[in-house]
C-alpha cells in the first residue's frame, strides 16, 4: 500500500522500475518511520538534560531542585528511550538526524511545555499506563505530526519523505497505541515482511496492481457514479485497486479474506468514513464479478 501510494504521488511513475521502486520506497519509508520515532526519544532526552542541568545550578530554585518528573518518567517515553532494538535499527540505517539538527527537538519541546495540554498533564494526579500512553499519542498527533517546520525539514532532507509522511505518522500512532507495560521492544517497530513468501506476495501485488491501474480506475469510476472523483481519498482508491487485484489476479485468496483485510486497512490508515465507502464499492464489484463469472478462485469455498 505504501509503495503504491508513493508511486501514485510521483510525477513521473515508471512502471518498468516498479520492483526496484518497491524495495527503495519501502526502505525509505522505514527510515522515515525510525527518524520520527527517534524524534520522540530525543525530545525525552532533551527534557532530562534540562532537568539535570537545572538541578546542578549554584543558585537552583526549590522547583529546580525538586522538579516535577512526570514527563521524564512517562513510562512510554522511557520504554522508547531504553529500546535497544530501536537504537540498533537507527545505527544500522546510519540515522542521527536529531543529533545533527537539534533545533527541531528544542522547538517541539518548547511548544509542548508552553501549552495548557502539558500543564494539565503535569498537574494531574492520575497516574496509570493508559493515561501516560494517551498523553504521548496526543502529543504526537497535536504537536509533532502537524508541525510545519518539521515538515519543511523532512522535505528538504529527502523529498520523497513528505509523500510517505501521512502513512508513517498514522502507523506510529497505531504502534504507540499497542505499547503495554510488558510489551517487547519490537512492538514499536513494524515488521516489513513476515517471510520471503510475504515479500514475494508484496512484490506481485504491487506489480499487478500498478500494471492494471487504468482498468481498476475505470472500475471505480463506473461504480461510484454519484461521487466527485477528486474528492475520493487517494488511499481509498489505492486500497480498492489492491482489493480488485486480489479478486481478479490472486486465485488462492478468498473474497471474504480480501474484503476484511482492506476494510481493516481503511479503518487504520484512511479517513473515518473510509471503511463504509470502501465496503460499498467492493460489495458492488464482487456482485458484478460473480454475475460476469470473473471470480476464478481456486479451491472449494474460496469465492464466498
Report each predicted region and the residues it spans.
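Class I Rossmann-like S-adenosyl-L-methionine
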Residues: 1-304
Amino acid at each position: 500500500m505504501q509503495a503504491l501510494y508513493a508511486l501514485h504521488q510521483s510525477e513521473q511513475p515508471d512502471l518498468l522500475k516498479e520492483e526496484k521502486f518497491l524495495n527503495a520506497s519501502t526502505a525509505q519509508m522505514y527510515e522515515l518511520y525510525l527518524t520520527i520515532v527517534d524524534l520522540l526519544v530525543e525530545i525525552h532526552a532533551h527534557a532530562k538534560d534540562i532537568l539535570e542541568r537545572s538541578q546542578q545550578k549554584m543558585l537552583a530554585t526549590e522547583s529546580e531542585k525538586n522538579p516535577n518528573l512526570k514527563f521524564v518518567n512517562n513510562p512510554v517515553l522511557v520504554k522508547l528511550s531504553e529500546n535497544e532494538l530501536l537504537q540498533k535499527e537507527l545505527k544500522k540505517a546510519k540515522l542521527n538526524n536529531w543529533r545533527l539538527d537539534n533545533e527541531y527537538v528544542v522547538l517541539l519541546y518548547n511548544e509542548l511545555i508552553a501549552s495548557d495540554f502539558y500543564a494539565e498533564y503535569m498537574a494531574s494526579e492520575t497516574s496509570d499506563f493508559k493515561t501516560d500512553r494517551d498523553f504521548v499519542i496526543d502529543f504526537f498527533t497535536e504537536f509533532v505530526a502537524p508541525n510545519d517546520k518539521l515538515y519543511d525539514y523532512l522535505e528538504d532532507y529527502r523529498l520523497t519523505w513528505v509523500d510517505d509522511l501521512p502513512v508513517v505518522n498514522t502507523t506510529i500512532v497505531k504502534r504507540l497505541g499497542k505499547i503495554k507495560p510488558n510489551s517487547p521492544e519490537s512492538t514499536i517497530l513494524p515488521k516489513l515482511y513476515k517471510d520471503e513468501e510475504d515479500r514475494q506476495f508484496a512484490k506481485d501485488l504491487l506489480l499487478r496492481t500498478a500494471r492494471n491501474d487504468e482498468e481498476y480506475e475505470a472500475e471505480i469510476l463506473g461504480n461510484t457514479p454519484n461521487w466527485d472523483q477528486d474528492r475520493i481519498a487517494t488511499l481509498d482508491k489505492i486500497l480498492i485497486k489492491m482489493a480488485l487485484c486480489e479478486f481478479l489476479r490472486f486465485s488462492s485468496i478468498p473474497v471474504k479474506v480480501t474484503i476484511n483485510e482492506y476494510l481493516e486497512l481503511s479503518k487504520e490508515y484512511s479517513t473515518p468514513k473510509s471503511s463504509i465507502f470502501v465496503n460499498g464499492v467492493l460489495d458492488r464489484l464482487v456482485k458484478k464479478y460473480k454475475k460476469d463469472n470473473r471470480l476464478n478462485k481456486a479451491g472449494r469455498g474460496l469465492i464466498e
